A protein has these predicted regions:
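Adenosine-nucleotide cofactor-binding segment
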Residues: 72-73, 80, 87-150
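Rossmann-fold dehydrogenase core element
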Residues: 159-162, 173-213
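C-terminal hydrophobic helical "lid"/dimerization subdomain
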Residues: 145, 149-153, 193, 197-244
Length: 244
């Protein structure tokens, strides 16, 4: 999200992926990579278009059947947005597993049917209790190696797991025999191709609720303190925005 300050007639650049821009007051990008913020959507809300687009691409790869039961693991921005988008995609029940009661309460406010705090409950057992023999779709957003195996164990036979995170180490141990016995699919999801336009429309229509996910708005000159807060993992946060 941002304001266009200068628009050359044509900006020939192959890509933005190798260019600096993080925490900058200004950044130059090719015009074809820019989307108009819909009327009525604030700059703060529009800033969540990027994680929302990542979540939407993961949900599209999940190929959620109408009426399916879905488990989303992870209560951060991607998990929160993926859970809402699973609802929009036609799931009959969406369950979120996470580690903060406050974040799970926000998910409930945004329409998520059931939540599981994995510090207090067994995710696999509780997910099976809340569904018919397990969720048909699991979207894993936490990046926890253990959570990926939770997804495998909780999944209903013939179901699909979508992993949309980055895991510790070059390799992750997965119970592949269980994947095979369940005749399941394990799918990776990277970035957000062709997803910005749709999520901006969902956000503008109010179907995708992003304002409750913005837990902090800080000035750019407090960046160092914000990074310390995030690394400390002691304060509840979902999305932290910096304003120049």
């Amino acid at each position: 999200a941002g304001e266009a300050l200068h628009r050359p007639a044509e900006l020939r650049r192959p890509s933005y992926k190798n260019r600096q821009g993080v925490f900058a007051e200004y950044v130059a990008v090719p015009q074809r990579h820019v989307y108009k913020i819909p009327d009525g959507l604030s700059m703060e809300e529009a800033a969540l278009a990027e994680p929302a687009a990542t979540a939407m691409y993961a949900v599209s790869k999940a190929k959620i059947p109408a009426g399916a039961e879905v488990l989303v693991i992870g209560d951060g921005p991607i998990g929160q947005l993926a859970a809402q988008l699973a609802n929009i995609a036609g799931a009959s029940k969406v369950i979120m597993a996470g580690s903060w009661d406050e974040k799970l309460a926000i998910a409930k406010e945004c329409g998520i049917h059931e939540t599981i705090n994995y510090h207090k409950e067994d995710v696999v057992q509780r997910a099976k209790e809340l569904t018919e023999a397990g969720p048909e779709i699991v979207i894993e957003t936490s990046g926890s190696n253990a959570a990926l195996n939770m997804a495998v164990q909780a999944l209903k036979p013939t179901g699909r797991i979508v992993a949309v995170s980055w895991y510790n180490g070059a390799n992750v141990d997965v119970a592949m025999n269980t994947v095979i016995v369940k005749d399941a699919e394990l799918v990776g999801s990277l970035a957000s191709p062709n997803s910005f336009g749709p999520v901006l429309r969902y956000m503008a229509s109010g179907k995708l609720k992003v304002k409750p996910l913005i837990t902090h708005v800080k000035p750019l000159n407090e960046l160092e303190d914000v990074v310390k807060m995030i690394r400390g993992k002691k304060e509840m946060r979902i999305k932290v925005l910096l304003k120049p």
